[in-house]
Amino acid sequence: MSDRAQVQVYVCPVSRVPQDHLVLSHYLGFLSSAEKLRYDQYHPKAARLFLISRVLVKTVLADKLGISPHEVNLLLHPNGKPFVQGSKAVYFNLTHSADIIILAVTEEGEIGVDIEKVDREFEWMRVDSVLDLSEIEWIKEKELTDSSSVFQRFFQIWTLKESYIKCTGEGMSRHLKKLNFHVLPEHIQFLDSTNDAQKTEEYYFESYIYESNFIFSICLQQRHNLERFNLNCFQLLPFISTHRITPTPCTYN
């Protein structure tokens, strides 16, 4: 048995969930009265995203906890990060970009995940205030020979920063420029200049490419000093289909 931490990622492409009355009715049955009020307040596109996200989270967590999805009670920490009460500790985090929802789950420790679509029209230098000089230099390193790498590198750095603040639950209150990432061929180095250096070492990061035009990054708080985690990734359409997928790790020569 592996001594690495185990992380499961569930990818749900919203556009592949059938838009028919039977599916909608079935999914709505999993919402609490408070969640139904929230659902009713959204515009149709946002309401659909909220509904599918909730059903995805509840079905996956119910399986982990050995309970019914109707029994999954999602609560919020004071910092706004969601958690679930159960017979054992299960940590999770949710993200979405365009019509892709990603849920990351583990029993190891706090986890954060962020996904972004790689927009090759994005003027990333307009947000260079959130980047350390060393990050800017790395992003532009191959600009003359491979211009597309600039965007992949920028969105990798961005998702790494977001995954960390989602893992810690501190949100955008933390100055992103002070979260410095150095992406090496074998691992990702991280320095949080606003925090204790020893605490920084508790976090482990990985980045992946999904369907060629999305990048997602995972931040895992390693409570047992394990250097890596095993990732099992699935495409899941709740109550419709599930199959294993293999996202491509972000690598650079």
Regions from the PLM with identified roles:
Residues 1-253:
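Core catalytic alpha/beta fold that binds nucleotide/phospho-ligands
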